[in-house]
């Protein structure tokens, strides 16, 4: 059994910060569960494009407000607490936060730990692993 607290993870290398977000990676590839689980904060005013070419992601909004736009068809979906969006087709998308958003995110395949978006908006398939 693996037991971790959010507070412990926030105070460790499992907390990864970028310009638009901060992600606390609670479950990673080395945990051998077949997916990774993150609590991610999207900063207020963030507006950025992503394209997970190597991963599928589902995102559940716990707090805050914003929107996600799928670039293939230009559809815009509001995000508020209780909303889930699922990037089941490696959807190229834009995420915008009108208020800081706290999100629960699941990635398949799992991330290794220190991934940040590359110039195309994707995470690499393999990155440096976090070692506890």
From Swiss-Prot:
**EC numbers:** 4.2.1.108
Please give a single GO biological process term from the UniProt record. ectoine biosynthetic process
Recorded hits in InterPro entries, A to Z, give:
Ectoine_synth, RmlC-like_jellyroll, RmlC_Cupin_sf
Tell whether RNA-binding is among the UniProt keywords: no
Q: Which residues form a coiled coil?
A: none
Keywords linked to the UniProt accession: Lyase
Which Pfam families does the UniProt entry name for this protein? Ectoine_synth
Which terms in the Gene Ontology molecular function aspect does this entry carry? ectoine synthase activity
Catalyzed chemical reaction(s): (2S)-4-acetamido-2-aminobutanoate = L-ectoine + H2O
Q: Does the keyword Lyase apply?
A: yes
Named in its record, the pathway it takes part in is: Amine and polyamine biosynthesis; ectoine biosynthesis; L-ectoine from L-aspartate 4-semialdehyde: step 3/3
Please give the family membership noted in the entry.
Belongs to the ectoine synthase family.
Among NCBIfam families, the record links this protein to: PRK13290.1 (NF009806)
**UniProt-listed HAMAP family:** Ectoine_synth
Purpose of the protein = Catalyzes the circularization of gamma-N-acetyl-alpha,gamma-diaminobutyric acid (ADABA) to ectoine (1,4,5,6-tetrahydro-2-methyl-4-pyrimidine carboxylic acid), which is an excellent osmoprotectant.
Q: What is this protein called?
A: L-ectoine synthase
Organism of origin: Saccharophagus degradans (strain 2-40 / ATCC 43961 / DSM 17024)
Report which gene this protein is encoded by.
Answer: ectC
């Amino acid at each position: 059994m693996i037991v971790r607290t959010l507070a412990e993870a926030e105070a460790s290398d499992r907390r990864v910060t970028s310009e638009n977000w901060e992600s606390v990676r609670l479950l990673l590839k080395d945990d051998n569960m077949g997916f990774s689980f993150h609590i991610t904060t999207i900063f207020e005013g963030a507006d950025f494009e992503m394209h997970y070419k190597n991963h599928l992601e589902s995102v559940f909004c716990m707090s805050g407000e914003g929107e996600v736009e799928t670039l293939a068809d230009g559809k815009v979906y509001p995000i508020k607490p209780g909303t889930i969006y699922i990037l089941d087709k490696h959807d190229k998308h834009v995420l915008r936060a009108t208020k800081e958003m706290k999100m629960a995110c699941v990635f398949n395949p799992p991330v290794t730990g220190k991934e940040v978006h590359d110039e195309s908006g994707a995470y690499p398939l393999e990155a440096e692993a976090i070692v506890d």
